[in-house]
A protein has these predicted regions:
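Glycine-rich phosphate-binding loop used to anchor ATP phosphates in small-molecule kinases
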Residues: 75-153
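Conserved lysine of the Walker
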Residues: 16
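Conserved substrate/cofactor phosphate-moiety recognition/catalytic segment
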Residues: 25-86, 123-124
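Hydrophobic anchor at the beta1->P-loop junction of P-loop NTPases
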Residues: 8
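P-loop (Walker A) phosphate-binding loop of NTP-binding proteins
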Residues: 11
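Hydrophobic positions on the alpha1 helix immediately C-terminal to the Walker A/P-loop
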Residues: 19, 23
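NTP-dependent small-molecule kinase module
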Residues: 171-245
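A glycine- and Lys/Arg-enriched "phosphate-lid" helix/loop adjacent to the NTP-binding pocket
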Residues: 121-198
Length: 245
């Protein structure tokens, strides 16, 4: 049986881990769930520092500041740019290590459903550059590094994009109560909205077979919803049928 790499894509709290685990259970392990490794980022407090830094910068952007207030603003901007690049660099290196593990699993004939692939880094990095969390120079450096490093790396046989509206994402973030994400649920925080604006254009041009699953229309936590997703997977990549039989 051929092995397949299915990458689950989507905004924060879109349900990627949920679908990844559901596919593993549905196939009796013929598809192995491979969850995003974020322990290193969380243990070092990087994620919370990043969200705090960029949220502080967003609150001050566009205001007219002089004197001490202006100096304070520049410090906030500097912190946002530092953590903007730091967090992206850390995630990129972590996902690069994951690719090594995935390559071995695929060579051994194990199909994998992956919670967020390294290719989604392009969305988060572009968002950071758009919002001045990453300088133009650092953004160009990242793109050059990405192209160089990703040569001859395994590519997804299918990307499933879980599309969700921002209100639903914020509701899920509140519900799962992860402290480092609390800033994202604030009514005036536009971080999730900015990412959402980038996702659909990205998936349409990703260069891989893809599915778009509207999470407001399809609840894959239910048997009926999951079977609808499974049917769409098989229609898009017919070779995966044996995994679900």
């Amino acid at each position: 049986m051929d092995s397949y790499l299915i990458s689950i894509a989507g905004n924060i709290a879109a349900g990627k881990s949920t679908l990844t685990k559901a596919l593993e259970k549905r196939t009796g392990g013929r598809i192995m769930s491979f969850l995003e490794r974020v322990d290193y980022v969380k243990e070092n407090g990087y994620l919370q520092k990043y969200y705090e830094a960029v949220s502080a910068y967003d609150r001050l952007k566009g205001t007219k500041l002089v004197g001490k207030d202006r100096n304070d603003f520049l410090k906030v901007k500097e912190a946002a740019e530092y953590w903007g690049y730091k967090i992206q660099e850390t995630y990129f290196l972590s996902r690069l290590l994951d690719l090594g593990v995935l390559s071995e699993l695929l060579r051994e004939g194990q199909s994998v459903a992956q919670d967020r692939s390294i290719y989604e880094d392009q969305i988060f990095t572009k968002n950071s550059n758009n919002n001045e969390y990453i300088t133009d120079e650092d953004y160009r450096r990242y793109l050059d590094l990405f192209k160089l490093v990703m040569r001859n790396k395994p590519t997804p046989d299918l990307i499933i994009y879980l599309e969700s509206d921002v209100a639903a994402l914020k509701s899920r973030i509140v519900g799962r109560s992860r402290g480092e994400e609390s800033e994202l649920a604030d009514p005036g925080n536009s971080y999730l909205s900015n990412l959402n604006d980038l996702y659909r254009p990205w998936i349409m041009k990703c260069g891989f077979p893809y599915l778009i699953v509207d999470t407001e229309e399809i609840d894959f936590r239910t048997e009926q919803g999951l079977e609808q997703v499974v049917g769409d997977i098989i229609r898009t990549v017919p070779g995966t049928k044996d995994l679900f039989d």
